[in-house]
Amino acid sequence: MNLKNPLLAVCLVFTFEGYSWWDEGHSLVCNKAANLMSADTSANLFSILESDDYGEGCVWPDVIKQVERRETGPWHYINSPPGKDVITPDSCPEKGCIMSAYEEQLSLLRTGNDAEKKDAVRFIGHFIADIHQPLHTGFGYDRGGNDHLLKLNGNKKSNMHSIWDGEILDFLYKTHGKKDVHKKIDDLAKKYKRNLNYNDDVYPWINESRKIAVSDSVRYLDNRIQNVDEGYLKTHGSIVIDRLALAIARLAILLEVELSG
C-alpha cells in the first residue's frame, strides 16, 4: 500500500489492530476481486476510483472512521445478543449497521454522482469483506469480541476479534508461506465465481458468519476461550481462507453486474 499521505500513515500505525480484517485482508479481497473481473468491468472500476489499486481504496473506510467520519464506525458490523442467531433487518439499530450502510452505498453506486460512486465502491468492497469476518456479527456486550480478552500462545495479549481479523491469517502466512496461502485463496475464489450467481442481498452472508461465530469450535459463545494456541489457529485457518475466497468471488460477481453499464 502506498502511503503518500502522512496523516494516513499515522492513522494506520496507531489504529492497526482495531481494523477489520486488518488492512492486509481488505487489500487482498478487493485486489483479487478486481483481478477476477472482466477487462471492461475492471476498467470501469478503476475509472470510478481514479486509481488501479482497489485494495488501497478498500482500506480507506477504516481510516476515515477514526477521525474524519466517526459516524461511519457503526457501519462496519452488526451486533446481536446471544440466543438471537438469525440476523434480520430488525437487528439493525437506529444509528445504522453494516447491512443498512451496504444498501445505502449500493444505491449511491447506482445513482450517485462521481464522488459518491467513488466512495460507494470503496465502502462496498470493504463491507463485503467485513461481512465475511465472523466476529463482525458478534455480541454487543463485548463489542464483537474486542473485549473478549485472551492470550495468544500463552503470552501475547490479544482479543477474540483480533484473532479472527488477522492473527489466523498471519499464522497461515508464517506456517505455509504467503504465496501458497494466496494460491489457495485464488483457486477457491475462482471456483466460487464459476458456481455462484449474482446476489445483492447480504443477509445470507451475514448469517453464514454468525453461524460460524457462535459455533462450538470457535468458543466465543460457550466455553469462552482464554488462550489461543497454534492448534486453534491451524484448525480455523481453513475457515478464514474460505471466507476470504467467498468475499472475493461475491464482490467480483456483484461489481460485474453493477458496473457493466
Question: Which positions does each model-derived feature cover?
Answer:
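N-terminal, motif-rich segments that launch catalysis or mediate targeting to/interaction with membranes
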Residues: Y19-F127, P134, F139-G261
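N-terminal signal peptide c-region/cleavage motif recognized by signal peptidases
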Residues: T15-E17
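Sec-dependent signal peptide recognition
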Residues: N2-A9
